[in-house]
Regions:
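Accessory beta-strand-rich segments of carbohydrate-active enzymes
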Residues: 1-90, 94-96, 120-121, 136-140
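Active-site-adjacent substrate/metal-binding segments within catalytic domains
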Residues: 1-8, 13-20, 26-27, 62, ...
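Solvent-exposed, conformationally flexible loop/turn segments
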Residues: 2, 44-46, 108, 151-155
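Short glycine/proline/serine/threonine-rich loop/turn segments at secondary-structure transition edges
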Residues: 2-4, 43-46, 124, 164-180
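Beta-strand-rich binding/interaction modules
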Residues: 20, 107-149, 156-161
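Beta-strand-rich interaction surfaces with strong enrichment in secreted/lumenal proteins
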Residues: 24-27, 37-41, 101-102, 144-150, ...
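Short strand-edge motifs at loop-to-beta-strand transitions and within beta-strands
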Residues: 33-37, 154-160
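Hydrophobic/tyrosine-rich beta-strand signature of extracellular beta-sandwich/beta-rich modules
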Residues: 51, 131, 181-183
Length: 241
């Protein structure tokens, strides 16, 4: 097939078994983590998706807590379609694109992207990974495109490190400034965008000291703990739109 189909379940507590059109698609243990199943070979024009959820399992962490272990599908379920070249969908429910800020201070910031890319086609293909960085106001700061190729069936990690961003606006709880990094896979021959992921990032750094306590962006910062359970009336742990 020229398209791939994936079922993403953001959370089902505590264990889930999934069937598509009566055939086993996969299972997952853990009520607080997302998971993705490749259902490409199971999908047809009209589909029946059956998800059986069990919250009675006592061998799945957390084994004990002072709150109620609710059961059921309590976060969104998605059917995702991709081309044969796409970001890796088999990395523990993630997007396959990981963004960090190895340099973050009031003078300069650097963005690093590590993207896992998969080629599900039966032949080698030449691609480009394109990254665009926008500031909090939506202004394009940097753009970059680096070529690479993948063999048939290969998954590889492609890395990118930005040029220095001068005087970045730092993130704080009082002023949570966020930049945006858009990462795309592009067909090197046709220029077609095959897959694209957008991530928000904040430039900040922190440290701990036995005498000075916690510091954010080089300044002492008081931490305030909040004892709030993932539980609310009348929906329990469910998250609405």
């Amino acid at each position: 097939p020229t398209k791939r189909y994936y079922l993403k379940i953001d959370a089902a507590s505590k264990a889930a078994d999934v069937k598509v059109n009566g055939q086993v698609a996969g299972s997952h243990a853990g009520g607080y983590s997302a998971f993705i199943l490749d259902v490409t070979g199971l999908i047809r024009e009209n589909n029946e998706i059956e998800i059986t959820v069990d919250n009675a399992r006592r061998d799945i962490t957390p084994l004990w807590a002072d709150f109620t272990f609710w059961g059921g599908i309590y976060r969104d379920v998605w059917l995702i379609t991709t081309p044969e070249q796409h970001f890796n969908m088999a990395n523990y429910g993630s997007t396959g694109v990981f963004v960090s800020t190895p340099v973050a201070n009031e003078r300069e910031g650097v963005v690093q992207v590590k993207a896992e890319v998969t080629n599900d086609a039966d032949s080698r293909i030449r691609l480009k990974m394109q990254n665009r960085i926008y500031d909090a106001q939506g202004k394009l700061l940097q753009t970059n495109a680096q070529p690479f190729s993948l063999k048939a069936g290969e998954t590889a990690t492609v890395e990118y490190k930005s040029d220095v961003i001068d005087n970045p606006q730092l993130w704080t709880p009082e002023m949570p400034t966020l930049y945006r990094v858009v990462t795309a896979i592009v067909n090197a021959k046709t220029g077609e965008v095959l897959d694209e992921i957008s991530n928000k990032i904040g430039f900040r750094w922190f440290s701990f000291d036995a005498d000075k306590g916690f510091s954010l962006n080089g300044k002492p910062y008081k931490l305030r703990g909040v004892n709030r359970h993932q539980d609310q009336a009348p929906v329990g742990v469910a998250i609405d739109d």
